[in-house]
Amino acid sequence: MIAYTTYLTDARVRREAETIASLPDYRVSVFVLKEHAEANTYILDGVEVVELNVAKYRGKNTMKYLVSYIVFLMHAFLKCTGKYMSNTLDLVHVHNMPNFLVFAAIIPRLFGIKVILDIHDILIETYASKFNGFSNRLFKYGLHVEEWICCKLASRIICTNHLQYQTLVDRGIAVKKLMVLMNLPDPAKFCMNGEKRNPMNQRGFRLVYFGTITKRLGIDLAIRAVNEIRAKIPGLQFYIYGSGEDRDEFLELSRQLNLDAIVHFSEHAVPLEEIISIVKSMDLVIVPNRKNVATEQMLPVKMLEGLALGIPVVVPRLKPIEYYFTGEQVFFFEPENVQSLAMTIAQAYQDKIGRDDKMKNAKKFFEKYAWETHKLDLIGLYRSLSTEKRPPLRKLLP
């Protein structure tokens, strides 16, 4: 697998890698970004994690993002080609962003190795929101070409939800290449295990956001909403876990609003096992996404993870969320409306019975879209691509 991510914090990459590594006839190596100053290689839950000597760029400069991607691509290309040359490669699974990481597998692909492109986020819409639209028509056209070429190069393409699937179909991507593998929490990790939580009145009311700290995902809206209701909810606390390009700006916003004693930021991204333990201790998960072309294609995984852990969620009325959920399962607010978000948090605080009812109803989602079913789909995809015969490298070389 190849992914421009830090392995310990990426639930989807870990879940898929661990699923395949659990099969007796598969060995999985994952090429990812380094977590610290030095790149390490280690084994975790049966997966060989190979950190490449590239750190994640967190900023707003388009060219610096592109350079970081290209440097990672070059490192991944060398590793992937090396595995193929040593006859230890049978299948390549590439996670976007960006899509062009599939070119790390260009040599194996030319010699018949199958390549899976796992589209977490559609690049065109994500970049339009990240960089405030496209001022450069050539850049926008380039992204469309990049998506088309990479999808042509891939043997199969994984989408994370049905709206994303339809968008790619509308753009002319062959239906036979596409499949939906939703970003569902692994019940082996994301479950309450019958744990009893402390009564709310013993520790105040605790809100949590966990994920990328960026303005396009609305964390500033959540901070302002907390400021609106700070006097209405005794013991209100808001915890923000993650990293991102706008963290310093949101820290300053919190200080300006005199929320230092209420809003708390983690120093860095938190490993998956630690974040699970943290979220279990919370009363409400906040998903404050803004409304834009990217979030209208996105089913927030943090919402699903919170629900899987038995924690009610507050979410914006966006197409992908309303496609899968109703007001009987989650607390909805109007997107980009601070007052609506504040009122919804206050409503959730006051309505303990409502919180419990929504959690009971949310179980219907996981009954319909069970990870165990998607897990079998993923394994089936791997087996179908792995069984196709190809000549060994030694017969192809002169």
Regions of interest found by a model, annotated:
Residues 34, 163, 184, 269:
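Carbohydrate-associated surface elements
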Residues 327-338, 347-352:
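Conserved acidic donor-binding segment of nucleotide-sugar-dependent glycosyltransferases
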Residues 169, 175-176, 184-203, 218, ...:
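Acidic anion/phosphate-binding donor-loop and adjacent secondary structure
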